[in-house]
Amino acid sequence: MVGSGAAGSASSLQGNGSNSSGLKSLLRSAPVSVPPSSTSNQTLSLSNPAPVGPQAVVSQPAGGATAAVSVNRTASDTATFSKYLNTAQALHQMGVIVPGLEKWGGNNGTGVVASRRDATSTNLPHAAGASQTGLGTGSPREPALTATSQRAVTVVAGPLRAGNSSETDALPNVITQLYHTSTAQLAYLNGQIVVMSSARVPSLWYWVVGEDQESGKATWWAKTELNWGTDKQKQFVENQLGFKDDSNSDSKNSNLKTQGLTQPAYLIAGLDVVADHLVFAAFKAGAVGYDMTTDSNASTYNQALVWSTTAGLDSDGGTRLW
């Protein structure tokens, strides 16, 4: 994702992530050794991780020199806890600050926040003029939340309590409370976290963090195709990205950078999840992109892609221009 470099709000959305399909690792953190029987509180520096006991408390120092995360676990949570620490390390390597997570106490046993506006304004800092809805900058506006969409967007405070649903995880998911001055938006859908506007990866439009089920590690990879929505929507997003890639291989994921195209056609000004649909808003014309498929017989081979309008994309309804 092309980074805007401006401070923004992180619209943190929850899912358990345990049903994510195996993903190829573009950036993989080193394993973290977690002893099964320690009871002391220790501080973990993500830049220099150390073994952590059942009560891991990591603070975020002034100036953001070290990313931080606070996670509570029991002795039986060793494997899952290690997975979250690996996720935090990967995020830190990408320049994303993981704020301290407080133990989630729930709300009447449900863990559901009334509205995302309340959740984001209470738990995460906002830049001046930044939207609290995840739909780009401008006047904050709250979309109507159905029972389904509310479940998808209300996780800023932490995960659901253990035992509330089949999607509950006993540990806080470090992905649910992310903030960085150059990370404008986050969204969660179908077991994947979409991270846009990271200044540390300026040659790519957006990234997805997922969990490799085989290794249990968090993996970073360039998301160049959406796995949900219609074919029309997928084609539109692939065009916006400037190239098409149907695989998650490291070589193809780095195709954009290695071929010298560092500015895709549009900048995505915002994204959100509403009623279980991923919504991109305010594509802005910025440059020329190319479909970099290696198949010379493809209809879009080396096709130049240029736009001069502002367009929106809904994963349910396709594209619309205004």
Curated annotation (Swiss-Prot):
Regions of compositional bias (Low complexity) in chain numbering: 1-48
Stretches with biased composition (Polar residues): 120-134
Stored InterPro entries: MgpC
Annotated region (Disordered), positions in chain: 1-59, 118-145
Pfam families: MgpC
Stated family: Belongs to the MgpC family.
Name of the featured protein: Putative MgpC-like protein MPN_367
